[in-house]
Amino acid sequence: MLKTIQDKARHRTRPLWAWLKLLWQRIDEDNMTTLAGNLAYVSLLSLVPLVAVVFALFAAFPMFSDVSIQLRHFIFANFLPATGDVIQRYIEQFVANSNKMTAVGACGLIVTALLLMYSIDSALNTIWRSKRARPKIYSFAVYWMILTLGPLLAGASLAISSYLLSLRWASDLNTVIDNVLRIFPLLLSWISFWLLYSIVPTIRVPNRDAIVGAFVAALLFEAGKKGFALYITMFPSYQLIYGVLAVIPILFVWVYWTWCIVLLGAEITVTLGEYRKLKQAAEQEEDDEP
């Protein structure tokens, strides 16, 4: 009886072990950590230009003036670790200085922000090993649409949420709304990763694979935020070594860790489809054998 149970358990865990081996093999072949380092470098280079472009878009629409403040606080509170307040203060100073630039400098900011999107596109298609390239004009249109519509849609969602919370009938649902708002960062991360894994690759990605990979990445991202904040709070070695400049290495490490999570979710999405194809091929070979 015990031997039968052990055999069944071993038989059930064998596919999972094979899938994990395939996942590790792809991570090693794709040099995932190196890709994450490249994206972290480009992200840090593009951070201020990207934020400057986003805030400039909000400034162009007076209806989003109040929402932009809420969105700013939401981003720094939920997508950066414990030092979000310090980083926010520095970035806002940099953005304020960028407002004094000429038209040529503004174009440079936009190009730098688009460079980040191109790097993300290149890294994800490397993981999917896609050889098909989009037309340059189409790629530019997609990047520009994400750069312009993304912040506006986020601002619109926050405006709608604020409006619903202000309604009288919503006062009886405060508990439910509070619970929903607590998981809102997780849902937003999940949807963002799902769109990233579904749209960016130039080959077709099965929707269920993208959903699973995005969900794992969202969970790791939320857990990583809490773990990183706990580490910074409990083991303040960076503050002891770097003093006032501690925010710089903390931001570097957090951005690198974030891209590791994003690319790991992409690897999981790819491996799910590849493992399914390999399994179907193996079953087909068994059926063809006399």
Swiss-Prot record:
Keywords noted in UniProt: Cell inner membrane, Cell membrane, Membrane, Transmembrane, Transmembrane helix
A GO-annotated cellular component: plasma membrane
Main location group: membrane
Keyword check for Repeat: no
Residue stretches spanning the membrane: 39-61, 101-120, 141-163, 183-205, 212-234, 244-266
Keyword Transmembrane helix among record annotations: yes
Stretches in topological domain Periplasmic: 62-100, 164-182, 235-243
Residue spans, topological domain Cytoplasmic: 1-38, 121-140, 206-211, 267-290
A Pfam family per the record: Virul_fac_BrkB
Subcellular location: Cell inner membrane
Membrane topology: Multi-pass membrane protein
Top-rank taxon: Bacteria
Record-stated family: Belongs to the UPF0761 family.
PANTHER family per UniProt: INNER MEMBRANE PROTEIN YHJD, UPF0761 MEMBRANE PROTEIN YIHY
Protein name per the record: UPF0761 membrane protein YihY
Source organism of the structure: Escherichia coli (strain K12)
